[in-house]
Amino acid sequence: MLRALSRLGAGTPCRPRAPLVLPARGRKTRHDPLAKSKIERVNMPPAVDPAEFFVLMERYQHYRQTVRALRMEFVSEVQRKVHEARAGVLAERKALKDAAEHRELMAWNQAENRRLHELRIARLRQEEREQEQRQALEQARKAEEVQAWAQRKEREVLQLQEEVKNFITRENLEARVEAALDSRKNYNWAITREGLVVRPQRRDS
């Protein structure tokens, strides 16, 4: 209590002096000191329900959109009536100006369409030439692969023909047998891990 009174006494000289007028009965002026019971009072705002606040905000937004749409509709209607009221020379001049601007825009649009059409034709021709070049390169590569495959098969055939000469057939079977019997090569030997040749020893009968 003493702290409140001292604070009230310290704050009084800093405030402007109250005007010398009779206040209304039952109501204080802005310059009157606060009551003792309200000096340390803290005004707390009332609690707000989040769901109710969300609903109110949605309704307020809908209200603003509706009012804005009505306002725009009213403004457009007023402008249309003013424009209809000014029918005459100004409206005719504006119509002529709009027609001339429309013709200029149509001419520019046609020129732009022709330019884009030419660019498209040039691009398609370029793509066609590139496609032909790719096809020619692909055909050349396939031809080279076919030629390489044919040469490889030809070499295999020649090698097989050379190997066929050493094959044993019915015609040269007897000659090959005689040649093998007349050969002095001895295949009856072995090699040790140390690289020595071991031949079978003949047993005396």
From Swiss-Prot:
Transit peptide: 1-27
InterPro entries referenced in this protein's UniProt entry, alphabetically: Ribosomal_mS26
Places the protein is found: Mitochondrion
Signal peptide boundaries: none
GO cellular component terms, semicolon-separated: mitochondrial inner membrane; mitochondrial small ribosomal subunit; mitochondrion; nucleoplasm
Predominant subcellular localization, coarse grouping: mitochondrion
GO biological process: mitochondrial translation
GO MF entries: RNA binding
Pfam families: MRP-S26 (PF14943)
Protein keywords: Mitochondrion, Ribonucleoprotein, Ribosomal protein, Transit peptide
Quaternary structure and interacting proteins, as annotated: Component of the mitochondrial small ribosomal subunit (mt-SSU). Mature mammalian 55S mitochondrial ribosomes consist of a small (28S) and a large (39S) subunit. The 28S small subunit contains a 12S ribosomal RNA (12S mt-rRNA) and 30 different proteins. The 39S large subunit contains a 16S rRNA (16S mt-rRNA), a copy of mitochondrial valine transfer RNA (mt-tRNA(Val)), which plays an integral structural role, and 52 different proteins.
Similarity comment: family membership: Belongs to the mitochondrion-specific ribosomal protein mS26 family.
Protein's UniProt name: Small ribosomal subunit protein mS26
Organism: Homo sapiens (Human)
Gene label: MRPS26
